[in-house]
């Protein structure tokens, strides 16, 4: 498995794949590329779990950046792309999962506060009235933003089941009731 996860990291870091178009270890400001960074952070956390600490400094740097971005907004959703106002609940769940994975690997506690704040925000502001499911997008930029969508909910529940299994189970029960 080590050679496989190593190849995944190499491909994810490649300048033709990463949005910075250069060696990511030389990037000083990760900017508003939360969508790429959330997935890279999960890959790096998975690498550490399987193969060791080769990328731990990059994993830590990205984790801290994602945490800062997430905590800087009252809706606790990081920016996902530089020129897009949309903030997807499922992607924020993936960001929090990536922080939780870093915590699991390194005996840290980066994910606790953002997880608690995000869940509180979601429960207070983003519950679809007729289903109880979380809304798809929190900025209201699309006509379907307030509506739960199947693919988005499945993704959100999958990641949330790691950092808050009880809340994920509630959403899963509602998902099966209203989406299946």
Regions found by a protein language model. Name each.
Residues 1-52:
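Post-signal peptide N-terminal segment of secreted/secretory-pathway proteins
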Residues 30-44, 73, 80-93, 99:
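Aromatic-lined, polymer-binding surfaces characteristic
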Residues 21-26, 78-84, 134-141:
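Short linear capping/connector segments at secondary-structure termini
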Residues 28-39, 54-57, 109-113, 147, ...:
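Residues within HEAT/ARM-like alpha-solenoid scaffolds
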Residues 37-40, 44, 59, 63, ...:
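Hydrophobic core/packing positions within alpha-helical solenoid repeats
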Residues 2-22, 57-78, 109, 113-133, ...:
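Long, well-ordered core segments of solenoidal/helical folds
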Residues 85-180:
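Extended ligand-binding clefts on enzyme/binding-domain cores
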Residues 45-53, 68-75, 104:
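Alpha-helix capping at helix-to-loop junctions
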């Amino acid at each position: 498995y080590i050679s496989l996860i190593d190849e995944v990291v190499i491909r994810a870091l490649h300048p033709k794949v990463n949005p910075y178009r250069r060696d990511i270890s030389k990037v000083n400001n990760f900017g508003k590329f939360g969508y790429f960074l959330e997935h890279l952070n999960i890959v790096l956390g998975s690498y550490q779990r399987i193969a060791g600490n080769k990328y731990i400094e990059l994993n830590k740097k990205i984790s801290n950046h994602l945490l800062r971005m997430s905590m800087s907004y009252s809706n606790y959703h990081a920016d996902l792309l530089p020129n897009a106002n949309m903030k997807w609940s499922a992607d924020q769940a993936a960001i929090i999962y990536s922080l939780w994975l870093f915590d699991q690997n390194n005996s840290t506690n980066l994910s606790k506060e953002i997880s608690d704040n995000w869940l509180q925000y979601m429960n207070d502001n983003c519950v679809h009235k007729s289903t109880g499911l979380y809304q798809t997008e929190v900025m209201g930029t699309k006509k379907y933003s307030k509506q739960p969508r199947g693919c988005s909910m499945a993704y959100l529940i999958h990641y949330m089941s790691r950092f808050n299994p009880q809340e994920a189970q509630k959403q899963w029960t509602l998902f099966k009731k209203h989406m299946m």
